[in-house]
From Swiss-Prot:
It comes from the Eukaryota. ATP binds at G14, K15, G16, G17, V18, G19, K20, S21. It is found in: Cytoplasm. Signal peptide: none annotated. Binds 4 [4Fe-4S] clusters per heterotetramer. Contains two stable clusters in the N-termini of Nubp1 and two labile, bridging clusters between subunits of the Nubp1-Nubp2 heterotetramer. One of its GO terms (biological process) is iron-sulfur cluster assembly. The keyword ATP-binding applies. Its cofactor is [4Fe-4S] cluster. This is Cytosolic Fe-S cluster assembly factor Nubp2 homolog. Heterotetramer of 2 Nubp1 and 2 Nubp2 chains. [4Fe-4S] cluster binds at C188, C191. GO terms for molecular function: 4 iron, 4 sulfur cluster binding; ATP binding; ATP-dependent FeS chaperone activity; metal ion binding. InterPro entries: Mrp-like_CS, Mrp/NBP35_ATP-bd, NUBP2/Cfd1_eukaryotes, P-loop_NTPase, YlxH/NBP35.
């Protein structure tokens, strides 16, 4: 039930392990920090990370007459979260489902969660281009989906998979809002100097090639990693960091896009 949701943003990655869930989570927290009411929907069925990243593991969800009730991280209900992880007994429990059951569960999460009034719903998807993604796109055709943000790392193998993701989005008709390059450089926790330990600027080059916006470059910052397991935003805890600057720019970019309709 997305009738009370003003804006829907899908976060995609062509490859696993690029930090997509961390970007989704910190984007949701940044939007909340700037005064928005936000929902975060984790439909990465085989690798749900959001409950861990927000310190919500062990939370119980229940159903009311109107559907699933999400987990709220605060009394003001400014951040609502739903994940398959809440239905598992342990983070190590595998989800051994065939395609049709996965499709059914994703449809349930997209159609049967009782969201309150939300300014933004961030949808954290599985990596790749699979049946799950097709199901998401089909369901979102019935609601005003603003578009997709693609997360990548600078390495060539990740960028190759992002090219497939871009093609997938174009074929399924979802608007590409831009690319975020993650894990580009390492920030020393002592002197905050950023050193490129992998290749760099691959996300920028790919964005230029695909003619879509480059939304920012995020480094590996151990200080950001320490925030995992809490609902603390980088914007409040590390306001001077390069990660905070990128997230501020991303929030402003989304606010501008949504204001334009």
């Amino acid at each position: 039930m997305l009738d009370k949701v003003k804006n829907v943003i899908v976060v995609l990655s062509g490859k696993g392990g690029v930090g997509k869930s961390t970007v989704s989570t910190q984007l949701a927290l940044a939007l909340r920090h700037t005064g928005h009411k936000v929902g975060l929907l984790d439909i990465d069925l085989c690798g749900p990370s959001v409950p861990y990243l927000l310190g919500l593991e062990g939370s119980d969800i229940y159903q009311c007459d109107d559907g699933w009730v999400p987990i709220y991280t605060d009394e003001s209900k400014t951040l609502a979260v739903m994940s398959i992880g809440f239905l598992l007994k342990s983070r190590t429990d595998p989800v051994i489902w065939r395609g049709p059951k996965k499709t059914m569960m994703i449809k349930q999460f997209l159609q049967d969660v009782k969201w309150d009034e939300l300014d933004y719903l961030i949808i954290d998807t599985p990596p790749g281009t699979s049946d799950e993604h097709i199901t998401v796109m089909e369901c979102l055709r019935e609601v005003p989906c603003n578009g997709a943000i693609i997360v990548t790392t600078p390495q060539g193998v990740a960028l190759d998979d992002v090219r497939k993701e871009i093609t997938f989005c174009k074929k399924t008709g979802i608007k590409l809002l831009g690319i975020v390059e993650n894990m580009s450089g390492f920030v020393c926790p002592h002197c905050t100097t950023c050193t490129n330990i992998f290749s760099s600027n691959g996300g920028i080059e790919l964005a230029n090639l695909a003619q879509i916006p480059h939304l920012g470059t995020l480094p590996i910052d151990p200080r950001v990693g320490i925030l995992a397991g809490t609902t603390a935003s980088v914007l409040s805890e590390l306001p001077e960091s390069s990660t905070a600057e990128v997230l501020k720019g991303l929030v402003q970019h989304l606010d501008t896009l949504t204001a334009q309709g």
